[in-house]
């Protein structure tokens, strides 16, 4: 079915910043998609087009990206009479029209908004759920419910505390279903709130951008200790493991790392990549840490390679790989990490996201689907993670509606699948081998 109309507009993300929303109409109805945006962005990401007009939204408006959709992309796609089930064809058309390496002409936010809306319309055209359509596009005969990685303690660029490392996550791998994983996650979250309140006072339970707590602690080990205590109090020490997103590029300074980067600069406290690696090894030894994302700077390839070779845990590339097939290919060759963080807005189209995922999976990597810190109520990534069978998703704490929107959609998908529902559980790194 061809596209009747496409209309983009500025809406607001969860941080009160403008973002792009796209309405796409076919004979089957209206299909709407909204684009997220990140706070700690990798320098190699596709370009998110902002207006940079300081008199409006402090320069963060997206009226240019919206205009590119309404004035250029929409008329072109409508005149070409393309069928919405032809995801790759439509994405390629937009990429050719943009003509730049990093989507800087239209903006990844313009292209992605249309691409997501097309995918939703394609599912309706086929009369199947979105996750099934995505599975078909990726060539997956079955679908898998993911283990949720709940970001329950926030630091780094997401929080006003002194904590350098950005996310401390809990993964309920011992659950039997996604629904049970949600219950375990919520119960640990509420126990954690009480633990933090008792130790640091009530204002320490204010939440960060992704719904996690941001107590004013400096030591990263203290965050792990809080998690360990909360998991124990909830009674799930045998079912919950820990993941971290260090976002080390945020505190990389001249070949070294500053674990107190939110205080006045003092080069004497910087540590070497080897010292930082030793710190991680201590975390893995003393806590149930099974996954570390962005342990080093996005260009510190040697440190990545050395660390990944020395551990058996999941090492996730985000700023390193930015969902970009060229960066992923280099990381595969260098054995820099063993898991891809998949963010649709880093690469900027559904087709390229699928390609990035398949490239990682075909090389034996894990894949974790991810939200961004600036989110909307759009639930596309919930269907994406099920269709791509990656087995793991991070989309914040079980708090804040823009986070719960995704988790609640996953609950609905599991319910809809009924007896056919499969939950990744302890096989979250490679869920297809059961």
From Swiss-Prot:
SUPFAM superfamilies on file: Enolase C-terminal domain-like, Enolase N-terminal domain-like
Residues given in the record as Mg(2+) 2 binding sites: 245, 293, 318
Pathway field: Carbohydrate degradation; glycolysis; pyruvate from D-glyceraldehyde 3-phosphate: step 4/5
Cellular component terms (Gene Ontology): cytosol; phosphopyruvate hydratase complex
EC class (word): lyase
Family: Belongs to the enolase family.
Keywords: Cytoplasm, Glycolysis, Lyase, Magnesium, Metal-binding
UniProt cofactor(s): Mg(2+)
Localization (cell): Cytoplasm
HAMAP family registered for this protein in UniProt: Enolase
E.C. designation(s): 4.2.1.11
InterPro entries reported for this sequence: Enolase (IPR000941), Enolase-like_C_sf (IPR036849), Enolase-like_N (IPR029017), Enolase_C (IPR020810), Enolase_CS (IPR020809), Enolase_N (IPR020811)
Tagged with keyword Lyase: yes
Catalyzed reaction equations: (2R)-2-phosphoglycerate = phosphoenolpyruvate + H2O
Active site residues per record: 210 (proton donor), 343 (proton acceptor)
Signal peptide coordinates: none
Organism: Gallus gallus
Example GO molecular function: magnesium ion binding
Cofactor binding remark: Binds two Mg(2+) per subunit. Required for catalysis and for stabilizing the dimer.
Binding site for substrate: 158, 167, 293, 318, 370-373, 394
Assembly and binders: Homodimer.
Protein name: Alpha-enolase
